[in-house]
Amino acid sequence: MGIAAVRFKRDNPYAVRRESGCMHGGIMDTEEFWEFALLRYARPGVAQCCVALQDAHGANVMLLLYCAWRAQGGECVRDAALRQATARLEPLDRHLVRPLRAARRAIRRAADALDSPALAVGADRLMQAELAAERRQARLLADGASSLRAGPARACAAQSLAACLEGCGTAPAQARMEGARLAALVFDC
């Protein structure tokens, strides 16, 4: 999934309960982005949309949320910045996040099929490891922010998300449609 299929409930220790603005330029960037990602991922429809884009187009959920985070401040992520961000994430994604996700999903399916609490605990542990790897991706993205231009948040998000999806090989028209859909979910309450 993205953000490790964390179930965002009141008792979730990973769910952040307050909203805050973005401060681009260091450790606060990482924490602000991570908080934004958790909050927005918890919004109705966002997780499902992100996971669908991940599964259908190979989109990186953290990169999608990063585009939305930067758009929150009116910054559009350009193609060159997307390519750089994708290159920064690729080794971690290929060697850690995707294998953890695949293992977690397989174990979760087995736990459900066999009604096995022990396997469910194993899947939950893998989910925590996947979440830690995604947090590392958030750090890489926040630390490498550059090549942005200003504009309205939702419009920038739609544009940046469409560019991100096109980078995954999605047809331009579909990328624009899916980008606009996710931008609406992220920014509309």
Predicted feature locations:
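Short, mixed-charge aromatic SLiMs
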Residues: 84-99, 163-171
